[in-house]
Amino acid sequence: MIRAFLVVALASVAVFSAPIPEVPQNFDDIPAEYKGLIPAEVAEHLKAITAEEKAALKELAQNHKEYKTEEEFKAALKEKSPSLYEKAGKLEALLTAKFEKLDATAQALVKKIIAKGRELHQQYLAGDKPTLDSLKELAKGYIAEYKALSDDAKATITAEFPILTGFFQNEKIQAIVGQYVN
């Protein structure tokens, strides 16, 4: 599931085509306005990643095309960095527990997004890259589905994944979405 969340996060960045000045190398480099959106348990996992584990993760990311399934990726992670594999397993368990607390309609939307993310990832690995227009349409559809959720469903997302709510409610992000997703 962690890989699926990473795929969704990376796809979101690609979809919105927002210029990113620099990817933070350390948790402390993340702007304070975004740190507050990261659940404490996730923040602790991020802070606990060592320089060696970051290097292993970077190498695995560079070789992402070699891993056709989540299981292959996990096996490579375990071989490359057993300590990072253990940390990733704990984070995956945490995210799974949070996912299970979501309202059923929120779960359905998240499952749909994850499934599409996996599908896009497989297409990418096969050399079939989606067009920016198709990604824009996909993003617009998911944004509309999120907005159509009940207040209760949105409340469970806010409680369990505040970073997602922050993403959908942040004025700067809404401006970017308005600019790039038309």
Curated annotation (Swiss-Prot):
Coiled-coil residue windows: 46-73, 131-152
Compartment annotation: Secreted
Any one GO molecular-function label of the UniProt entry: fatty acid binding
Major location (coarse): secreted
Highest taxon above the source species: Eukaryota
Keywords carried by this UniProt record: Coiled coil, Lipid-binding, Secreted, Signal
InterPro entries for this protein: Gp-FAR-1
Pfam families: Gp-FAR-1 (PF05823)
Its biological purpose: Probably binds lipids.
Protein family per UniProt: Belongs to the fatty-acid and retinol-binding protein (FARBP) family.
Record's protein name: Fatty-acid and retinol-binding protein 2
Organism: Caenorhabditis elegans
Encoding gene per record: far-2
